[in-house]
Structures are given as C-alpha cells and as structure tokens.
A protein has these predicted regions:
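Conserved short submotifs of the Hanks-type protein kinase catalytic core
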Residues: 97-110
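Activation segment of protein kinase catalytic domains, centered on the conserved DFG
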Residues: 117-129
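A conserved short helix/loop substructure at the end of the activation segment
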Residues: 243-246, 260-272
Length: 407
C-alpha cells in the first residue's frame, strides 16, 4: 500500500464531524480515491474513484522530534500492511491554516456508540466476536513490535461491509510535542503503571483490552460517572476495577481480570489472550441457535436495568483522550494488597486473634468479605469493586452447559 500526499483540492464536501481527543475530525470525499490495483497493460496504478474518508488533524507536527516521525512512519506502514488495522492513505494540508491532516479510511460506527445502541440485542456469541476481532488486530500490532498506547472504544471501528472490527489511530495518539513527564490517553483505559509515571509497554495495551472487555459485557464505558480525573487515577492505582456484570461467562471473566491486574507481569501477552478468546468463540459457535436465543432473552431485562442505571451518570468529558499530568502517586497495587493492611488494623482494634493457618488455608476470602461488609472502605457495591485475585480452581475454567444454561 502506498502512503501518499493528497492535495487538499482533491478533497470535497469537507464537514466537521467531532473532536477526537485534541484533534478535530472531518468527513470528506476524496475525488480520485486510493490506489486500487495495478494495470499491467497500461503499466500504471488504477485508482478506486470517489471515496468517503476521514480527515484527522495532527497537532504541533512542526515541533515533533525525529523519533516521532520515525514512529509515525512505521505505524503508517503497519496500518497499510494488515487489513485488521484501519488504513491511513496519506497526508494532506489545510491551506487556510497550514495544519497537517491524516487521510483515513472511513468506517461505519465506533464501538462505544455501537454498544449503546445494540447492547440489549447482543448475545454473548456476538460480544465475544467483537473481543476476538480486537485482540486479533492487537496481536498484529504487537507482532510488529509496536504499541498502540491509546486503546479505547472510540477508536475501535466497525465496517458493515466486511462485518469486522478494526483498531484505528495507530501511532498518532496525542500531540507530537507531548512533554515527557505527562501521559496522553483516555483515563479509564490507561494502565495504572502508566498513570503512576512508568513507561508504556505492550502490557499497558493488554490492560486497555481488559477495560474494553468489560465495556463489551456491560454496554457502557468503565467508570462512567467520575467527575474528577485525579480521584479516578488514584482509585485505579489503588486497585479499583469495574464490577463484573452478572451473567458474564466465567472464562471471559477470568481473562478480563488477568488483563486488568495491577502487576503487568501477571497480565497475559496478546497471543495467550487471543487464544483464550478464540477458544471461547469456538465454544459459542458450536451452541445451537435455540440456546443462544434463550440466553439473549434471559439477559435482555438485566441489560436494560444496567444500561438505565449507568447512562444517568455518564460523564462525556471523561471519555476523551487528552494530556494528563499526575504527581506523587503511589505504586499500583491490586486491591487485595491494600485491603489486607486495612484488615490487620481492624483486627487489632477489635482485639481479634486469628490463627494464621486457618486464615490462609480455610477462610481468608470469607473473613475478608465479611469485614468489607462490616466496614465501609469507600467501596460502592453498585458501581465498582476492589478486584480480588482469581480464586477459581482450574476445574472452574471448563466450559459446561448445566440444564441447558450457558455459563
């Protein structure tokens, strides 16, 4: 695929669409369209013809360093090499203000809007297919030794023609001149170690996938009612995660929790995650349509209740990629680590003498959950949970359909 310069006068019907993060986004018609095929007789490339495209502004490119340009070029090549990534055809420049813009293939809808419009009609088979397409696309990005850095439901795009989900915005996340002591992204999807100031790695992308998996299950963005970025950042670092939606398949839940573990080394790599999602999709594809329809009907009312309760609280300003700058944040941890310290203080205050062997081997989880119910450590049971380590045995991971029901 050729990355080309698109003359601005070759674009028509340019209309403002929205503001995506710090970039203004427009729709347009590219008169000539992309290169489609090679005409061996005429010995020239044949163009597609009139084509709808997206124009995305690039901020402060003139101040970018050489590394930014090298990374941008590499990611452009990746996006045009693999069909699972939204294609970027090239660059153009608005002559009225001198701003550079990406010329990108246009999709039909993003994941956030799609879920909000269709959640009550989606079966688990359809939801897992979404997760499958996303993890497949990310596996390709990681195989090219690249990192996305800003995965969220606004840049997961759907093509009705191809019936496939794509990842977009690869390599152009944030301003070119972003300060080194700041981070850029959509806060609910940013990994805790990145929030606390560490470098972004592939495992940070995996954390974002965990948040997307939860959004696919619930139909709503995570932490949708938070008003304060700093409070949300601190809670994420301290182990707060969204509450698992009732009816979520156990295998899916386990993978999701592994993805959002506070310790990056505990998260699966993308190949392991993709294999898990793929096996789950295969399982659901072998289930009869009758059982799938029963499962969809059973979840319909539950999803309506979830969506109605969550939609009242959505803070649209939170779900925008932007620059964040947090100082003096603690090291990320899973909530069980922080809770254990709180419980030890409670035991001392109540003069509770516990047998360590009993606590470790017989009832640790039960004791801790009882203490959580008795003492309110700023946990809202209706909206978020301080996520515990996965206590399921290996036997729990086996797929079963007891009494014709899907779990």
């Amino acid at each position: 695929m050729i990355i080309e310069w698109v003359p601005y006068n070759n674009l028509q019907n340019i209309e403002y669409l929205t503001k995506g993060g710090i970039s203004e986004i427009y729709t347009a018609v590219w008169i000539d369209g992309r290169y489609e095929e090679w005409d061996s007789k005429e010995q020239k490339l044949i163009r597609y013809g009139r084509q709808e495209v997206i124009l995305k502004g690039l901020e402060n490119v003139e101040n970018a360093n050489q590394r930014w340009f090298e990374e941008a070029e590499s990611h452009l090549k990746i996006s045009n090499k693999w069909p699972q990534i939204v294609q970027c055809f090239g660059l153009t420049q608005n002559p009225s203000n001198g701003n550079y813009m990406l010329v990108i293939d246009r999709a039909d809808i993003d994941l956030r809007k799609y879920l909000q419009e269709t959640q009550n009609q989606l079966s688990w088979k359809e939801r897992i297919k979404i997760a499958h397409d996303i993890t497949l696309a990310l596996s390709i990005i990681h195989s090219e030794s690249a990192i996305h850095r800003d995965l969220h439901s606004g840049n997961i795009l759907y093509s009705k023609l191809n019936q496939r989900w794509y990842i977009s915005d690869l390599g152009f996340c944030g301003p070119a001149d972003k300060l080194t002591d700041s981070i850029y992204g959509n806060l609910p999807y940013i990994a805790p170690e990145v929030i606390s100031g560490k470098n972004t790695t592939k495992k940070a992308d995996i954390y974002s996938i965990g948040m997307l998996m939860w959004e696919i299950s619930s139909g709503q963005p995570p932490f949708s009612y938070y008003e304060n970025d700093y409070n949300l950042a601190l809670n994420i670092i301290n182990g707060m995660r969204p509450k698992v939606i009732s009816g979520t398949p156990l295998k899916y839940e386990n993978l999701m929790k592994q993805c959002w573990d506070a310790d990056p080394s505990n998260r699966p790599d993308i190949d392991t995650l993709f294999d898990g999602i793929y096996s789950l999709l295969q399982y659901y594809q072998n289930i009869s349509n009758e059982i799938l329809q029963q499962e969809t009907n059973n979840n319909l009312e539950n999803n309506k209740i979830i969506n109605n309760s969550m939609s009242k609280h959505i803070n649209s300003t939170l779900f925008t990629s932007k620059i964040h700058k947090f100082k003096n944040l603690p090291e990320p941890k899973n909530a069980i680590e922080g809770m254990s310290r709180k419980f030890s203080k409670v035991f001392k205050k109540l003069n509770i003498k516990s047998n360590n062997d009993i606590q470790i081997n017989y009832g640790k989880e039960i004791v801790e959950q009882q203490q959580i119910r008795q003492y309110n450590f700023n946990i809202d049971d209706e909206d978020e949970t301080y996520d515990y380590k996965n206590f399921h045995s290996e036997e729990d991971n086996v797929f079963e359909i007891p009494d014709g029901k899907i779990i």
